[in-house]
């Protein structure tokens, strides 16, 4: 039995160790892609499990998430490697500034530039004076009263009652609601008899 254990090939190291050894062994400045890492591991360790491709993919993803590897442009780098490019942030990078260009002058708050938003409408001086005069007075509660009609001569008698809406002869003020249905004047049989 001791001979069986001695003749067995040594077990393969864990995948993270093999991946890091492959990246170091390939020593590519632009990083190592997944297929290059896989070929290196197959060439060095020979007999691998049948699920090697899926295991390699899973371990690469796990190492990338944990920060052991940096993934950039479909290539993997060691996180602590000095030649690994810095990880790019999200979004569009800022424009490169010319070092010889002079620094922009700080904006003064009293500059004549336009402010944000729509400019206010021009107010007439009368409206401005009324608004300023009534600014101190509190607004009364409730609905404001109706304004009285201002005719040329004020009549002491109350206004006459509006004519019935049914006749249509005078164009007076109409009453509220739906007007009554107009029936044609038909002589009734009882009135004729």
Swiss-Prot record:
A motif (Nuclear localization signal 1 (NLS)) lies at residues 86-92. Residues 11-81 form the H15 domain. GO terms for biological process: chromosome condensation; negative regulation of DNA recombination; nucleosome assembly; regulation of DNA-templated transcription; regulation of endosperm development. It comes from the Eukaryota. GO terms for cellular component: nucleolus; nucleosome; nucleus. GO terms for molecular function: double-stranded DNA binding; nucleosomal DNA binding; sequence-specific DNA binding. It is found in: Nucleus, Nucleolus. Residues 75-193 are annotated as: Disordered. It holds the Pfam family AT_hook. Phosphorylated by CDK, this phosphorylation prevents DNA-binding. Motility is increased when hypophosphorylated. The keyword DNA-binding applies. The keyword DNA-binding applies. Keywords: Acetylation, DNA-binding, Nucleus, Phosphoprotein, Repeat. A motif (Nuclear localization signal 2 (NLS)) lies at residues 145-149. Residues 87-98, 113-124, 138-149, 173-184 bind DNA. PROSITE patterns: H15. Belongs to the histone H1/H5 family. Binds A/T-rich DNA (e.g. present in the storage gamma-zein gene promoter) with a highly dynamic distribution into the nucleus. Probably involved in endosperm development, during cells shift from a mitotic cycle to endoreduplication leading to massive synthesis of storage proteins (zeins) and starch. Confers resistance to nickel NiSO(4) when expressed in yeast (e.g. S.cerevisiae) by counterbalancing nickel impact on cell cycle associated with an increased chromatin condensation. This is HMG-Y-related protein A. It comes from Zea mays (Maize). The lineage of its organism: Eukaryota, Viridiplantae, Streptophyta, Embryophyta, Tracheophyta.
